[in-house]
Protein backbone atom coordinates (compact mmCIF):
# COMPACT_ATOMS: atom_id res chain seq x y z
CA UNK A 1 0.00 0.00 0.00
CA UNK A 2 2.84 2.40 0.74
CA UNK A 3 3.99 2.16 -2.88
CA UNK A 4 0.55 2.17 -4.54
CA UNK A 5 -0.27 4.76 -7.18
CA UNK A 6 -3.74 5.90 -6.21
CA UNK A 7 -4.03 8.33 -9.12
CA UNK A 8 -5.09 5.41 -11.32
CA UNK A 9 -8.33 5.30 -9.32
CA UNK A 10 -9.04 9.01 -9.63
CA UNK A 11 -12.71 9.81 -9.99
CA UNK A 12 -14.10 7.08 -7.70
CA UNK A 13 -17.22 8.17 -5.82
CA UNK A 14 -16.33 6.70 -2.44
CA UNK A 15 -13.17 5.94 -0.45
CA UNK A 16 -13.51 4.06 2.84
CA UNK A 17 -10.85 2.95 5.28
CA UNK A 18 -9.76 2.36 8.82
CA UNK A 19 -6.08 2.04 9.61
CA UNK A 20 -4.96 -0.51 12.21
CA UNK A 21 -5.87 0.80 15.64
CA UNK A 22 -3.32 -1.11 17.72
CA UNK A 23 -1.27 1.99 18.49
CA UNK A 24 -4.33 4.17 19.10
CA UNK A 25 -6.52 2.12 21.43
CA UNK A 26 -6.43 2.29 25.22
CA UNK A 27 -6.28 -1.51 25.12
CA UNK A 28 -2.68 -1.05 23.95
CA UNK A 29 -2.01 2.06 26.04
CA UNK A 30 1.22 0.63 27.44
CA UNK A 31 2.58 0.38 23.89
CA UNK A 32 1.09 3.59 22.53
CA UNK A 33 3.10 5.48 19.93
CA UNK A 34 0.25 7.71 18.73
CA UNK A 35 0.22 7.87 14.93
CA UNK A 36 3.29 5.76 14.45
CA UNK A 37 3.55 1.96 14.49
CA UNK A 38 0.83 0.09 12.63
CA UNK A 39 -1.48 3.10 12.76
CA UNK A 40 0.85 5.14 10.53
CA UNK A 41 -1.07 3.59 7.62
CA UNK A 42 -3.55 6.38 8.31
CA UNK A 43 -1.24 8.65 6.33
CA UNK A 44 -1.61 6.31 3.35
CA UNK A 45 -5.36 6.85 3.57
CA UNK A 46 -4.72 10.60 3.45
CA UNK A 47 -2.49 10.13 0.41
CA UNK A 48 -5.15 8.00 -1.28
CA UNK A 49 -7.72 10.69 -0.55
CA UNK A 50 -5.53 13.40 -2.06
CA UNK A 51 -4.63 11.39 -5.16
CA UNK A 52 -8.06 9.87 -5.86
CA UNK A 53 -10.16 12.93 -4.95
CA UNK A 54 -13.36 10.91 -4.45
CA UNK A 55 -16.72 12.58 -4.02
CA UNK A 56 -17.15 11.04 -0.57
CA UNK A 57 -14.93 9.42 2.04
CA UNK A 58 -15.39 7.57 5.32
CA UNK A 59 -12.65 6.83 7.85
CA UNK A 60 -13.18 4.85 11.06
CA UNK A 61 -11.11 4.31 14.18
CA UNK A 62 -11.39 3.60 17.89
CA UNK A 63 -13.10 6.14 20.15
CA UNK A 64 -10.59 5.40 22.90
CA UNK A 65 -7.72 7.18 21.12
CA UNK A 66 -6.09 10.11 22.85
CA UNK A 67 -7.00 13.69 22.01
CA UNK A 68 -3.73 14.33 20.19
CA UNK A 69 -4.33 11.51 17.71
CA UNK A 70 -7.94 12.58 17.24
CA UNK A 71 -6.96 16.15 16.42
CA UNK A 72 -4.23 15.10 13.97
CA UNK A 73 -6.71 12.90 12.09
CA UNK A 74 -9.38 15.62 12.13
CA UNK A 75 -6.98 18.25 10.81
CA UNK A 76 -5.73 16.09 7.96
CA UNK A 77 -9.21 14.92 6.94
CA UNK A 78 -10.72 18.38 7.28
CA UNK A 79 -13.63 17.43 9.52
CA UNK A 80 -14.51 16.43 13.06
CA UNK A 81 -15.63 12.87 13.76
CA UNK A 82 -19.00 11.70 14.96
CA UNK A 83 -18.94 9.13 17.75
CA UNK A 84 -21.30 6.22 17.20
CA UNK A 85 -21.63 3.18 19.43
CA UNK A 86 -22.79 0.02 17.69
CA UNK A 87 -25.07 -0.58 20.67
CA UNK A 88 -27.54 1.76 18.98
CA UNK A 89 -28.20 -1.07 16.54
CA UNK A 90 -26.85 -4.39 17.87
CA UNK A 91 -26.10 -6.20 21.13
CA UNK A 92 -22.47 -5.04 21.21
CA UNK A 93 -20.81 -2.05 22.86
CA UNK A 94 -18.46 -0.78 20.16
CA UNK A 95 -17.79 2.97 20.34
CA UNK A 96 -16.05 4.29 17.23
CA UNK A 97 -15.18 7.61 15.63
CA UNK A 98 -16.27 8.16 12.03
CA UNK A 99 -14.82 10.95 9.90
CA UNK A 100 -16.78 11.62 6.73
CA UNK A 101 -18.02 14.28 4.34
CA UNK A 102 -21.22 12.32 3.74
CA UNK A 103 -24.13 14.59 4.76
CA UNK A 104 -25.89 12.17 7.10
CA UNK A 105 -28.03 12.81 10.18
CA UNK A 106 -25.52 13.18 13.01
CA UNK A 107 -28.04 12.66 15.79
CA UNK A 108 -26.98 9.25 17.05
CA UNK A 109 -29.90 6.87 17.72
CA UNK A 110 -30.45 5.78 21.34
CA UNK A 111 -29.22 2.41 22.53
CA UNK A 112 -31.27 -0.44 21.10
CA UNK A 113 -33.04 -2.85 23.48
CA UNK A 114 -31.36 -5.87 21.84
CA UNK A 115 -29.32 -8.01 24.24
CA UNK A 116 -27.15 -11.09 23.89
CA UNK A 117 -30.17 -13.25 24.62
CA UNK A 118 -31.74 -11.98 21.40
CA UNK A 119 -28.87 -13.17 19.19
CA UNK A 120 -27.79 -16.38 20.96
CA UNK A 121 -28.09 -19.67 19.10
CA UNK A 122 -29.88 -22.71 20.51
CA UNK A 123 -28.28 -26.13 20.73
CA UNK A 124 -24.71 -24.82 20.64
CA UNK A 125 -22.18 -27.69 20.30
CA UNK A 126 -20.25 -28.77 23.38
CA UNK A 127 -16.94 -27.63 21.87
CA UNK A 128 -17.86 -24.02 22.59
CA UNK A 129 -18.38 -24.62 26.33
CA UNK A 130 -15.74 -24.38 29.06
CA UNK A 131 -15.30 -26.68 32.02
CA UNK A 132 -13.56 -24.13 34.23
CA UNK A 133 -15.32 -23.45 37.55
CA UNK A 134 -16.99 -20.06 37.86
CA UNK A 135 -16.77 -17.36 40.48
CA UNK A 136 -19.97 -16.22 42.19
CA UNK A 137 -22.63 -15.33 39.63
CA UNK A 138 -24.34 -11.93 39.87
CA UNK A 139 -27.11 -11.59 37.28
CA UNK A 140 -27.46 -7.87 38.04
CA UNK A 141 -24.13 -7.18 36.37
CA UNK A 142 -23.10 -7.03 32.72
CA UNK A 143 -20.08 -9.23 33.43
CA UNK A 144 -21.95 -11.63 35.67
CA UNK A 145 -19.03 -13.90 36.61
CA UNK A 146 -15.45 -14.88 35.78
CA UNK A 147 -13.96 -18.24 34.91
CA UNK A 148 -11.40 -19.51 37.41
CA UNK A 149 -8.20 -20.10 35.51
CA UNK A 150 -4.85 -18.42 35.02
CA UNK A 151 -5.44 -15.87 32.30
CA UNK A 152 -5.94 -12.14 31.85
CA UNK A 153 -9.02 -10.79 33.62
CA UNK A 154 -10.62 -9.67 30.36
CA UNK A 155 -10.30 -13.20 28.96
CA UNK A 156 -12.01 -14.68 32.04
CA UNK A 157 -15.07 -12.44 31.79
CA UNK A 158 -18.42 -14.10 31.27
CA UNK A 159 -21.19 -11.83 30.01
CA UNK A 160 -24.77 -11.78 31.20
CA UNK A 161 -27.16 -12.74 28.34
CA UNK A 162 -29.54 -10.02 29.54
CA UNK A 163 -26.97 -7.33 28.67
CA UNK A 164 -24.88 -6.37 25.66
CA UNK A 165 -21.41 -7.81 25.13
CA UNK A 166 -18.19 -5.82 25.18
CA UNK A 167 -16.44 -4.83 21.97
CA UNK A 168 -15.47 -7.74 19.74
CA UNK A 169 -11.75 -7.81 18.97
CA UNK A 170 -9.62 -9.43 16.29
CA UNK A 171 -8.62 -12.69 17.99
CA UNK A 172 -8.11 -16.15 16.54
CA UNK A 173 -8.03 -18.39 19.59
CA UNK A 174 -6.42 -18.89 22.96
CA UNK A 175 -9.78 -18.54 24.75
CA UNK A 176 -9.80 -14.83 23.89
CA UNK A 177 -13.27 -14.83 22.32
CA UNK A 178 -16.11 -13.14 24.20
CA UNK A 179 -17.97 -15.47 26.54
CA UNK A 180 -21.55 -15.72 27.70
CA UNK A 181 -23.38 -17.55 30.49
CA UNK A 182 -25.56 -20.21 28.87
CA UNK A 183 -27.58 -22.56 31.07
CA UNK A 184 -25.36 -21.86 34.06
CA UNK A 185 -22.17 -22.60 32.09
CA UNK A 186 -19.64 -20.38 30.40
CA UNK A 187 -19.09 -20.71 26.68
CA UNK A 188 -17.48 -18.71 23.92
CA UNK A 189 -19.77 -16.94 21.50
CA UNK A 190 -20.06 -18.83 18.22
CA UNK A 191 -18.93 -17.38 14.87
CA UNK A 192 -22.58 -16.97 13.86
CA UNK A 193 -23.25 -15.01 17.05
CA UNK A 194 -20.22 -12.84 16.25
CA UNK A 195 -21.72 -12.23 12.81
CA UNK A 196 -25.04 -11.20 14.32
CA UNK A 197 -23.23 -8.80 16.67
CA UNK A 198 -21.76 -7.04 13.63
CA UNK A 199 -25.00 -7.06 11.64
CA UNK A 200 -23.84 -9.73 9.18
CA UNK A 201 -26.03 -12.51 7.74
CA UNK A 202 -25.68 -15.91 9.42
CA UNK A 203 -22.71 -17.90 8.05
CA UNK A 204 -21.49 -14.95 5.99
CA UNK A 205 -17.90 -15.92 6.88
CA UNK A 206 -18.36 -19.70 6.86
CA UNK A 207 -15.92 -20.26 3.99
CA UNK A 208 -12.97 -19.98 6.42
CA UNK A 209 -12.08 -21.66 9.73
CA UNK A 210 -13.50 -20.49 13.06
CA UNK A 211 -10.27 -18.76 14.05
CA UNK A 212 -10.23 -16.67 10.89
CA UNK A 213 -13.94 -15.95 11.27
CA UNK A 214 -13.45 -14.50 14.76
CA UNK A 215 -10.48 -12.41 13.59
CA UNK A 216 -12.19 -11.12 10.46
CA UNK A 217 -15.43 -10.20 12.21
CA UNK A 218 -13.63 -8.56 15.13
CA UNK A 219 -11.65 -6.45 12.65
CA UNK A 220 -14.74 -5.39 10.74
CA UNK A 221 -17.30 -2.62 10.85
CA UNK A 222 -20.84 -2.94 12.15
CA UNK A 223 -23.06 -3.15 9.06
CA UNK A 224 -25.96 -1.27 10.65
CA UNK A 225 -23.75 1.70 11.55
CA UNK A 226 -22.41 2.00 8.02
CA UNK A 227 -25.93 1.68 6.60
CA UNK A 228 -27.02 4.51 8.90
CA UNK A 229 -24.24 6.75 7.56
CA UNK A 230 -24.75 5.72 3.93
CA UNK A 231 -28.54 5.99 3.81
CA UNK A 232 -28.41 9.64 2.73
CA UNK A 233 -26.43 8.61 -0.38
CA UNK A 234 -29.52 6.98 -1.87
CA UNK A 235 -30.97 10.46 -2.26
CA UNK A 236 -27.76 12.07 -3.55
Question: PLM ranges: what are they?
Answer:
Residues 1-236:
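Conserved active-site and SAM-binding loop architecture
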Amino acid sequence: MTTADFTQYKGFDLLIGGSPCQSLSIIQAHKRTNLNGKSKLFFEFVRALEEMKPKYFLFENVASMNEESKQVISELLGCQPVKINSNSFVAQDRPRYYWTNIPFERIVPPESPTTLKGIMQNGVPEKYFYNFPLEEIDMNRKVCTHMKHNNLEMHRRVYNPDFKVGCLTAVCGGNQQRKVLDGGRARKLTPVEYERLQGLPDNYTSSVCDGQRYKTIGNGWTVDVIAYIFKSLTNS
